[in-house]
Amino acid sequence: MDLRKSPLYSKYIESNAKLVDFAGWEMPISFSGLIKEHESVRSSAGLFDISHMGVISVKGINPKDYIQKFFPTNLYSFSEGQGLYTVMLNDKGGIIDDLIIYDLGIQENDITELLLIVNASRYEEDFQWIKNNLNKDEISITNFKKAKVLLALQGKKSFDLFEEWIDSSISHIPNFGCEYKIFEHISPKEKIFFSKTGYTGENGLEILLSKKAAINLWDFSISKNVAPCGLGARDTLRLEAGMHLYGQDINEETSPYEAGLGWLVHLENNHEFFGRRFLEEQSRLGIQKKLVGLFIEGKAIGRKGCTVLKGEENIGTITSGSWSPTKQQAIAFAYINTSHALINNEVQVLIRGKKFKGVITKRAFYKKNY
């Protein structure tokens, strides 16, 4: 099967990017090298093409009323011009996807529009799960992205760079805030969507725009010495920041409580949602495993599937692992038996038949200091 290509594919070729198959898309794993790209984001700014991700539009009168049942988080806890990170659950409380929902407000004829930014590998599952569990007359569900480009400008200088590009201030927009507006000097008739969000632990923006406007932003960024970045750096940045990767750290067999996402479950809101009974039971009885962070001694990397031991007892499994360019240390996430999931608990990680010392830590290995 032919791989899907981003509208910016020609820019990858110009930049000699190394390309890989990711969720059916031919995407750059790196441009100048993972470490260099990672450090560019941590020190100044980097630009990612994340057009492989899905964007679902949900329209209707009070659409939150209809889609609330898919999410354990109270959808009325955010309003127009804001975004909300949450998880979509199956009927057993397992995570179908983690995503961000944006409220674009009332557009026309009292119709409110919500945008759901979902993982590339889960777009079809998400779309069908919503569609199959809603009355078609209640609400409109469509693929919003179509031929558009989704870019992520990330790093401590990202806000200044974006303000220069749009020739306008964004200081009034809070974190997880968004706007959907026309910038005449960029694309006179095009509404550009952008939000103060990201997947790196730094300040950042995610921008949905036409191919023409995206090329404009790409070229502008390169002219300002912003590093084009690939999926490799995106993975190490998100791991340092303590952010989950769907299919590795979370899936339909893991619950929000197990994944350290219990703060997204608003049982006190009393709204019905898929999996509520299972999560009520977990809240009452506790969980058997918990996602934690690990520092691993030496330079060996604990990859997905590596066993975590306490003495000779198998107490867990690594889900994600990498060398941390910022910490200069091997780091990982692992699901650990709850009784052993204690901060500073010393464990062993089995890597290629050898045991390496590990120490359980909080899942966020890095936090920005500005």
From Swiss-Prot:
Disulfide bonds: none annotated. It catalyses: N(6)-[(R)-S(8)-aminomethyldihydrolipoyl]-L-lysyl-[protein] + (6S)-5,6,7,8-tetrahydrofolate = N(6)-[(R)-dihydrolipoyl]-L-lysyl-[protein] + (6R)-5,10-methylene-5,6,7,8-tetrahydrofolate + NH4(+). It comes from the Bacteria. Coiled coil: none annotated. Belongs to the GcvT family. Its EC number is 2.1.2.10. The keyword Transferase applies. GO terms for cellular component: cytosol; glycine cleavage complex. Keywords: Aminotransferase, Transferase. The glycine cleavage system is composed of four proteins: P, T, L and H. It is an enzyme of class 2 (transferase). GO terms for biological process: glycine decarboxylation via glycine cleavage system. This is Aminomethyltransferase. The keyword Cell inner membrane does not apply. The glycine cleavage system catalyzes the degradation of glycine. GO terms for molecular function: aminomethyltransferase activity; transaminase activity. InterPro entries: GCS_T, GCS_T_bac, GCST_C, GCV_T_N, GcvT/YgfZ/DmdA, GcvT/YgfZ_C, TrmE/GcvT_dom1.
